Every structure is written in structure tokens, then in C-alpha cells.
Amino acid sequence: MTTDVKEKATFKLLDLIDSVTGKKSLLLERDLSGILGQIVTTNTLQEHGIPQVYWFNENIPNDIEKKTIYLCRPTYENAKLVATHVRQFQRDMLRIESTVIVLPTSNILFETVLQEEGVFGELLVTEWPLHAVPLDKDLLSLELGPEKLEESLLQRSTDALIDFERTHGRFPRVSGRGPYAAKMLELLEKTYQEEATINFGKVEGEISALYDSVLLVDRSLDRITPFLTQLTYFGFLDEILGIQQMNVKLPSSLVNRNEASNTGPMKKFSLSSSSSQITKEIRDINFNCIGPYLSKIARKLSSDFEGRRQAKTVNQIRDFVSKLGSLQSEHTSLNIHTGLAETLVQHTKNNYFQKLLQLQHLLVSHADSFTQFNLLDEIIYAEAPVEEVFRVLCLASITTNGLRRKDIDHYRREITQTYGYYHLLTFQALIDAGLLRLRQSTNISLQKSLSYSTWLNTYPLVKDEVDEQNPEDIAYTYSGYGPLSVHIAYDILKGRDNEEKILKLQNMPGTYVDKWTLDQEKVMPKNLKTNVPGKRRVLVFFIGGCTYTELAAFRLLQEKEDLYEFTFMTTGMVTGSSLIRAFIPNIESLNE
């Protein structure tokens, strides 16, 4: 589904590279390495005149080519660094032809710094308009961090959506819920109005014949889901090891079983569904089922390998040989996933892990008990990562309409004494962001959050019994809790064309938006196409980030209800810990 986006990005990048003729060096911003790897291979770069890629930092490679390309984001720091390089070239009397490729677009700050440094005329600045990175066949990401400012996040989201429409046509319909969904719709309309004014009333682009609509999912309506521990395979992997641009870093011995120790450099392993059928099959299953599932795959592969003994005729042997490469690749993938699963299982044996899951379930179930505070004390005494502790506090604050002052004071003291006094700043940052709140009413021991109570009474968020092996309900993703964001979004899809349900949708918390692109398009285009007959294709856009469990929940609905075919775009992939880390101060900067 994202193939067109990748092909377009690849063509544009190679065109920019080829505009610099001959051999050239590529200096790459380190944080963009995963993104570049999603678009082109090292071999492709070599075919286009780049024999080697260097990291873009203060050190200039000794064997740099006479023509140099910088690939970076248009930040103040990068502009200063480019200027430092150019001045060094001048001091060394090197005639280096420098080209800067920024993504997705340049900006006034970047170019102003280059001008003030006196190097703007010494280089060429071009743009690689990669607004969203294709991470998988059904997933695009803007790769924005959780700390991205509101205005910038909304503008980048709007730009990415419009760029997607340039390839696939304008969405006939925009639906969603929440303040950021409403603001993004306003930005979309404003952009197209400005375009119409410039083009004398004409707006570029035809109505999409591929997509039914875009569904805006506002993270601010569901802060709960990211703070829970993800229990799907990919979700748990992201929690424990971290997934970057659909790659996970592993010890060399895990990738290559011939290496005896873990002392070698870490290696990347692709989690893209296109890289392995096994990966696609297991990415969304509940982690409790990963062992039996991998055993089942191992037995099947073993049976397939036995086919070589049964191959007797030339045709049978030829058929087996044609499959051998694929079988060996899947066998390697199975070994790596088995090693990953073993690593994750070891984490579940930590003395705080089960208490953490129990505490989270108590909070989302609205259990009126002080048990959760006793459990949190035990988790702190077990010296669980500080991010986990703050996740629980934020979860408690959201689900119980704020924390009592004495509880905030108690945990501020416990956390600073256990993890460091600089976390006083973390506390304040979370309070300023509204993730930790002081309860206004103190006469109820554990007052329920009005908004969360509304959602809890509206949707079956919590399930006491869930079939994790053969799931029928999205609550399998958290072993008893179904992501609120998915319930809200899917309710809109099912109810927006039902007159009886529209009033209910309009009266629920969070601004409800549902707008047709053009009045005359209230009848869907007759040539609307999907990969599966009878299904309506929808782009689900997560404003503020999404988790792998939410993707798994949508995919389950896609499979079970057979009504929609989803493509996902998100401002970034998040976990509760990555959200918390955005509020933790940098110790090094504090010591300067």
C-alpha cells in the first residue's frame, strides 16, 4: 500500500544524487541512517557514484571526494556544522563542491545561519521532500519525536497528508475526533483555500479513486494506551529493545549463530513484513503465545526441509532447489525471532514485571482500592526503570482525575531519593504538560476521572476473559484491555453514516469532525478501488504517535469484520517510556 510512496521517494533522492555528476562522498546525519536504509541500499548508492557513506559530524573524513553531498535535517546545529566544514575546506585550500540535501524541506532558520556564517554562496541547498517514511507495506511515519511542539507537529502532519494526496488523490472525506483532529482539518482546508486562490479557484489533484477517507486519531484523547505495557510481540519488542525504522539492534551472535560471543558490534535486523513471512505472521500475536507459535513454525520448516529426501526425479529436485533459498532465509529468521523471544522472556522474570502489569490492570479497571499504591511502592523498591514508575503515576492521574497532594509529595520524595534529585524537574515537566495533575476534590479516596468513566461506560475497554491464542476482541493486545483510541476511531467509521448514531458521536467527549472534501463528492467515486472487493480503504492518521499494539488492534478488526482495508500514517511510533523520556532533563546539560 505504501509502495508508491517509496518509489517516489527513491526516484527523487537518486535524481538529486545524480545531479552531482561523478564520484562523490555522502555525509549522513546519524539519525537519518534508518530512514535512508528504508529507501535505498548501499549497493544502489554505489551504483550512483557514492562509494562510501560517512557520518556527518565535526570530523571531516581524510579521504573525502572532491564532490560532497550532505544529507541532513534543516536544523540550527546542522547549519552551523555545514558552515564549519566549508570554512575548513577553505582554510585547507581544498576545492570541494558541496551540496546539501535537506529533508523534508529547507527553512528560513537553516538558510539564514548559512548566510550569517558566510557560506551560503559556497554550496547548493536542495530539498528531498520525504514527509513520511514508508516503514512497512501498510505503515508510514513522519518520524517525529514525542517532544515535537504542537504547531510544528500539526503543520508537518498536514504537509505529509497533502503530499500523500499528491500521489493518491484527495481524500473524499475527513473524519476524526479531538482538538488536534479539528485543528488539522482547519489547516488542510486553509492550505487548499490558499492554493485555490493562487490558481484562480482551481485546486490541484483529483478525488482519490483508491481511498474512501482519512480518519484522524488524536493522541490527546487517549493518553492511557501508551502508558500501558504493550503485550503484542512487536509492541513488547519496542518496549524492551526498541524498534527504530522497523529495525532492531541485536548482538552479532544472535544474527549469526557462528559467532560465539556477544562482544562484537550490534547488528540490525529488519522487522519489515516484506523481509520475512515469519515476521509478518507473528508481529501482532500476544506475547504469551509466542513460544507455541514459533514451535509450530519450526515443525513446518523441518517438514519442508525433509522434502529433499523425497525428491527423486529431476523436476522434484529442481522444485526443491528453487525453494531452498527461501527456506534457508526463513530458518535464519526463525532462529533470530527465537533468540528475541528468549530475551523478552528473561525480562518478564524481573521481580517487578508482574506487579507492574497487575497495577496497570487495576488502574484501567477503575478498581477502588489503595492496592495500587502499595504495588507502586514495591515496584520502586525493586528499582524498576524510572520511566516505568512515571508511566504508572501518569496512568493513575489520568484514570482517577488527578492524584492527591499527599500521594504526589510521597512519590516525589521516593523517586528523587531512589533515582536522583534531577527528577524534581521531570515531575514539574509532567505537571506542566497535564500528564500529572493534582486532584481538586479530596473528599473521595479515589475519585474516578469523569472523561475516563465516560469512555469506560461507552466502550467495552476492559475484558475479564480474552482468548489470546485465537483473538476475537482487540483487548487481546493488552491481555484484557482494548485500546481506547481504536474503539473511538472504529466507532466513527461504523456510525458516521448512521443518522441515529451521528447524534451520539457529536455528544461524546472531544470535538467530532466529519467533512466531505467537496459537496458534490458526497457520493463516493464510482471507480473507487481496493485490493479486496467489498472493502473500503481508509488511511488512519495518528496525530501524536501510535503504538504497535494499536496497529495490531486495527489489523484484527480488518481481518475479523472484513469491512475496511487500513493504511496507517503516524507522526511517530511511541511507547510510554519514550513519552516519559521526552520530559526527563538531560543530566549532561544540567552539569554544564
From Swiss-Prot:
Q: Which GO terms describe its biological process?
A: intracellular protein transport; vacuole fusion, non-autophagic; vesicle-mediated transport
Q: Name one GO molecular function term.
A: ATP binding
- Pfam families named in the record: Sec1 (PF00995)
Mention any one GO cellular component term assigned to this protein in its UniProt record.
fungal-type vacuole
Sorted UniProt keywords: Protein transport, Transport
Question: InterPro entries from the xrefs?
Answer: Sec-1-like_dom1, Sec-1-like_dom3a, Sec1-like, Sec1-like_dom2, Sec1-like_sf, VPS33_dom3b
Gene3D superfamilies this protein is in?
A: 1.25.40.850, 3.40.50.1910, 3.40.50.2060, Syntaxin Binding Protein 1, Chain A, domain 2
What family name appears in the similarity comment?
A: Belongs to the STXBP/unc-18/SEC1 family.
Q: What does this protein do?
A: Essential for vacuolar biogenesis, maturation and function. Involved in the sorting of vacuolar proteins from the Golgi apparatus and their targeting to the vacuole.
- What is the protein name stated in its UniProt record? Vacuolar protein sorting-associated protein 33
Q: Which organism is it from?
A: Schizosaccharomyces pombe (strain 972 / ATCC 24843) (Fission yeast)
